[in-house]
Amino acid sequence: SEVIRRRRDEFGLDSFNVGLGLKTIGGALGSVLNAPEHGIDYVEKHVLQDYADFDKLEVTDPYKNPKLAPILESAKRLKDRFPDVSMTTSVAGPISTAIAVRPVEKVLKDTRKNPEMLHKLLDLTVECSLRWFEAFYHEFGSVGTNFSDPVTCMDVISKAQFDEYSLPYIKKLIDGTKKIMGSAPGAHICGKTSPIWSDLADAGLFSFSIDNCEDLEVAKKAVGDRMRIAGNVPPVDVMKEGTIDEVIAS
């Protein structure tokens, strides 16, 4: 909360996000997460090594789940302290959530060897995400929403895999979010995404943040009349290590 206070007072912060990380729902479903003091958090043990255990998984309840309830309580405290600052929330995209439940190599094999169970897993991930949005709406009313789905980029999966295993569930997530919040979410997908821009716009995405490997002008010309476009600033070379002038130029 002190960081939010200083950002508001010193930089005029007009919004903050209290959301779920890429692995949070995986942890809520039973995967063992590890968050080192220095470094990126990771899944130490996936809960769904074998689909024989799938029926043991239940849609998460943000009010009762020990991984989710503290985040919701944190959001309440922050909103009480900063009632004048807009609050948003976020989840991970369907496939990115799935690999926090089941190892990525198995999920990718499932696209060919076990599509029926993979569809069930992806459906579960969306239901868990929508439950989070429902809880947030119940507590705070309509807020801005976003999802990050790095695994759905064209560097990891093919366009055919995207069409069958990612797009239908992104569409379900978007439609469900609209029904709950009254507005569509934004999204960020890392890496190469140009082959799926039109699909994302067709799915009803409100805004899309592209990675710095893609061309902002090309994205604007392709789909800028159908969804907002953002992003494209190199996060390390410019934002972390660049000068002020380089940040502005980028």
Question: Positions of the model-derived regions?
Answer:
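Active-site loop segments of alpha/beta catalytic cores
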Residues: 1-3, 14, 38-42, 60-250
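A contiguous, low-structure linker/loop signature
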Residues: 20-61, 77, 84
